[in-house]
Amino acid sequence: MRNPPLIVAALVILAATLSAAGNQRIRSFNKAKRLVMQIAGDDGRTLYCNCRFSDKEVDHDSCGYVPRRDTRRARRIEIEHVVPAENFGRSFIEWREGHATCVNKEGKPFKGRRCAGKTNETYRLMEADLYNLFPEIGELNGDRSNYRFGHVQSTDMEYGECQFKIDERVVEPRSEIRGDIARIYFYMDATYPERGILGNKSRKLFEAWDKADPVDAAECERASKIEKLQGNANDFVKRPCLEAGLYIAD
């Protein structure tokens, strides 16, 4: 007779082994963006405001979203890095200092994201990791920038009914996705160590968010789809999903 706890434990160990390898299949951000839209499907929702979208156009009425300023960008869907690419990108020397091959047609050297993406495979794999990517309203993608997550004192709601607040370079998301964000940070920090992704202060905050907002069916389903496409698991999602009987595994 099978022992369910032992099966779950074995799957958890396997997931931890696979997640440690990180993304090894998706080697370009452009491909990753297409896959993110594929995962979202016909009933796609944005992360920060839970707005419906189709054909890369946002349905503001579905979530009560009101553009703060950039109405053109507010209508379109972009792909958001939850852990900002700039934040882990700065750990790569090619981002900070450039590379001998990072020279434009005029012979001028360049650095930053473009150079890291051109020359460093590890950076490309991190940039394209599906667990860290979500469809998002373009305006929010721009406004969030590379700001850290935390608690914001201001009570002003600048985006209509969307509970997304920014103040003094700190972003506070709606309570329903705080655990999701925490588990993404845990995964990225564990999978790609020594990239400065998670400090002690942020870790304590995300541990609280993880407890307050446990996994739900939607998060588990998305993680399962990503594992099939990318080949590795986010154990910080998969483990509690398995324990709750919410993970769809082949």
Identify what each model region corresponds to.
Residues L11-A21:
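Hydrophobic h-region of N-terminal signal peptides that target proteins for export
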Residues M1-I7:
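Bacterial N-terminal signal peptides that target proteins for export
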Residues I7-V8, N87:
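A generic alpha-helix propensity feature with a strong bias for hydrophobic helices
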Residues A21-R76, L205-A208, A218-E219:
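Aromatic-lined ligand-binding clefts that engage carbohydrates, nucleic acids, or primary amines
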Residues P67-D250:
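Domain-level detector of nuclease and nuclease-like folds
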